């Protein structure tokens, strides 16, 4: 297929047009007074969202070059959401502002490489100031505040997340699912999570979230590597008769065995998933034993005189629900005996008390938390399916952002943290590096300005007022007042601000240093030929009808 090439300003201007369209669709969702975006779905009812990344994911433009620009910034929004759980709109607004300012200077003759270097130095200095200004998340109240803001100012969601963290600990496992009624609920169930994802994406049952979910499932636990199908065929036939899903946790599953499982999963013959066993060496054996005790199963190991070929269904563990993504496996509602679990917990506590190695102690404490902490399940209620999906997305975002706040600390929210950090940065740069530095200094005002505009205020006036002051002074877009942001509970996770700025600078630098684009030329499909009308000459005789 023929390709078209665009060069320099022509290419960058088209890329900018794509970024602008994406930005214009996403920016309206920003802040406590952000607006909704209605998205048409290929099937079912349209979805309503105030989540920037959900809007970005749906955007596909007809112009191939503009679409490349939009897709690059869309990737930034997604990566920011993956890493920090929030800040997607901030990253998009920053990327657009940096690209817009940069494009104007490069078109006027600035050196893109020097400009990029200045931008990188400015961003690094601002991030260092953000870190200095951050403070650790203290109690339940601050966790509630962070979660509330990330859930688009929904206090009920903020309180649910804070309650969940209080019950399972800051490092505990919290999952989100749909409630049967319209009320939100919080349940704590016995469960465990370990850091191994599915061995093949073909095991996925939810394509949108890329997760595999197995309900009322059997669990096969073995410390053996499975490479031949004949090893597990007898056991598979027995579980198929029971009609229940199966999760295989083994040292590894490869070759013919994995291929056969995937093919049978795709054909609908087996409802199955497979993951590698967590840990290494002796720790792996102990962790397999932990899972076995939690689920009421038995580790099939040759050391115990057990083989896969002769294994019975009674050896399998059982769980009410298993959720697997590309990185983690969560087992909820294991069917093991509570007394066995308590004995195992006591055994691990004894090992913690007797070990002298800090590393071993840390790993034992991780195992203890997995066994005894349980899994908090936030059940989201809503009156309609559209509302349910929108609310569930908000809870997921708020949960990730809250974990980010606990991890790295918090800064003042409402777009003010970037401005405060920038006020303390003074770099002595020259020529086009200075141009890059000034681009960042202007662009970091954009998030606050956009929050104010969405709330019905003049963005420029609000930014100027905030810049006149120092400390925690900022703008509360909910009521239009200038307040102490920490006292009002308007806070953002440092990680969200940091990653949003880093990703925005990264993608803007790529776009500004792009000198050519290559894309396929869409071939126009020829219109279908008109049918031959030769045999219809007799129609001329219809003239007498006049």
Curated annotation (Swiss-Prot):
The EC number(s) this enzyme carries:
5.6.1.7
Question: Chief location of this protein?
Answer: cytoplasm
**Its Gene Ontology molecular function terms?**
ATP binding; ATP-dependent protein folding chaperone; isomerase activity; unfolded protein binding
Which EC main class describes this enzyme?
isomerase
Q: Which CDD domains match?
A: GroEL (cd03344)
Q: Gene3D superfamilies given for it?
A: GroEL, GroEL-like equatorial domain, TCP-1-like chaperonin intermediate domain
Q: What are the recorded Gene Ontology BP terms?
A: protein refolding
A GO cellular component entry from the record = cytoplasm
User: Which parts of the sequence bind ATP?
Assistant: 29-32, 50, 86-90, 414, 492
Task: Name the catalysed reactions.
Answer: ATP + H2O + a folded polypeptide = ADP + phosphate + an unfolded polypeptide
Cite the InterPro entries for this sequence.
Answer: Chaperonin_Cpn60_CS, Cpn60/GroEL, Cpn60/GroEL/TCP-1, GroEL-like_apical_dom_sf, GROEL-like_equatorial_sf, TCP-1-like_intermed_sf
Q: Which Pfam families match?
A: Cpn60_TCP1 (PF00118)
Alphabetically ordered keywords of this record:
ATP-binding, Chaperone, Cytoplasm, Isomerase, Nucleotide-binding, Stress response
**Record's subcellular location:** Cytoplasm
- HAMAP family reported for this sequence: CH60
Q: How does it assemble?
A: Forms a cylinder of 14 subunits composed of two heptameric rings stacked back-to-back. Interacts with the co-chaperonin GroES.
Q: What does this protein do?
A: Together with its co-chaperonin GroES, plays an essential role in assisting protein folding. The GroEL-GroES system forms a nano-cage that allows encapsulation of the non-native substrate proteins and provides a physical environment optimized to promote and accelerate protein folding.
Q: Which family is this sequence assigned to?
A: Belongs to the chaperonin (HSP60) family.
NCBIfam families (alphabetical): GroEL, PRK00013.1, PRK12849.1, PRK12850.1, PRK12851.1
Q: What is this protein called?
A: Chaperonin GroEL
Gene this protein is translated from: groEL
């Amino acid at each position: 297929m023929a390709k078209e090439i665009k060069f320099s300003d022509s290419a960058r201007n088209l890329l900018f047009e794509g970024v602008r369209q994406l930005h214009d669709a996403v920016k309206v969702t920003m802040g406590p007074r952000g607006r909704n975006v209605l998205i048409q779905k290929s099937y079912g009812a349209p979805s309503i969202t105030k989540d920037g990344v959900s809007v970005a994911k749906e955007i596909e433009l007809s112009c191939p070059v503009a679409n490349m620009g939009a897709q690059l910034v869309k990737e930034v929004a997604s990566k920011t959401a993956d890493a920090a759980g929030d800040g997607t709109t901030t990253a998009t607004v920053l990327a657009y502002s940096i690209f817009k300012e940069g494009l104007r200077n490069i078109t006027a003759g600035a050196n893109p490489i020097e400009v990029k270097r200045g931008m990188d130095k400015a961003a690094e200095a601002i991030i260092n100031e953000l870190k200095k200004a951050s403070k650790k998340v203290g109690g339940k109240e601050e966790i509630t505040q962070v979660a509330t803001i990330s859930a688009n100012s929904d206090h009920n969601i903020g309180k649910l997340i804070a309650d969940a963290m209080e019950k399972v600990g800051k490092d505990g496992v919290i999952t989100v699912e749909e409630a049967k009624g319209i009320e939100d609920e919080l349940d704590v169930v016995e469960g465990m999570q370990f850091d191994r994802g599915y061995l093949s994406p073909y095991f996925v049952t939810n394509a949108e979230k890329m997760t595999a979910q197995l309900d009322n499932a059997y669990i096969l636990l073995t410390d053996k590597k499975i490479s031949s199908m004949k090893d597990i065929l007898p056991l598979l036939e027995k579980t198929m008769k029971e009609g229940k899903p199966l999760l295989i946790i083994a040292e590894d599953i490869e070759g013919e065995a994995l291929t056969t499982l995937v093919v049978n999963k795709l054909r609908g013959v087996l409802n199955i998933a497979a993951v590698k066993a967590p840990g290494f060496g002796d720790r792996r054996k102990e962790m397999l034993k932990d899972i076995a005790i939690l689920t009421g199963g038995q580790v099939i190991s040759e050391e115990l005189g057990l083989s896969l070929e002769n294994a019975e269904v009674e050896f399998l563990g059982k769980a009410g629900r298993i959720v697997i993504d590309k990185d983690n496996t969560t087992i909820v509602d294991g069917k093991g005996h509570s007394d066995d679990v308590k004995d195992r917990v006591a055994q691990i506590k004894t090992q913690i008390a007797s070990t002298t190695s800090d590393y071993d102690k840390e790993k034992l404490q991780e195992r203890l938390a997995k066994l005894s902490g349980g899994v908090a399940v936030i059940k989201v209620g809503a009156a309609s399916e559209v509302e349910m999906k929108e609310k569930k997305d908000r809870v997921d975002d708020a949960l990730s952002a809250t974990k980010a706040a606990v991890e790295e600390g918090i800064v003042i929210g409402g777009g003010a943290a970037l401005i405060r950090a920038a006020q303390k940065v003074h770099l002595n740069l020259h020529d086009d590096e200075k141009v890059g530095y000034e681009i960042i200094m202007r662009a970091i005002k954009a998030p606050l300005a956009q929050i104010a505009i969405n709330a019905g205020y003049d963005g420029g006036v609000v930014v100027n007022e905030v810049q006149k002051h120092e400390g925690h002074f900022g703008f509360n877009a909910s009521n239009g007042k200038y307040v102490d942001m920490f006292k009002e509970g308007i806070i953002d996770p440092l990680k969200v601000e940091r990653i949003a700025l880093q990703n925005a600078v990264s993608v803007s630098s790529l776009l500004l240093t792009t000198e050519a684009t290559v894309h396929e030329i869409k071939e126009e499909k020829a219109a279908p030929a008109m049918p031959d009308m030769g045999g219809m000459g007799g129609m001329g005789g219809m003239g007498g009808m006049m």
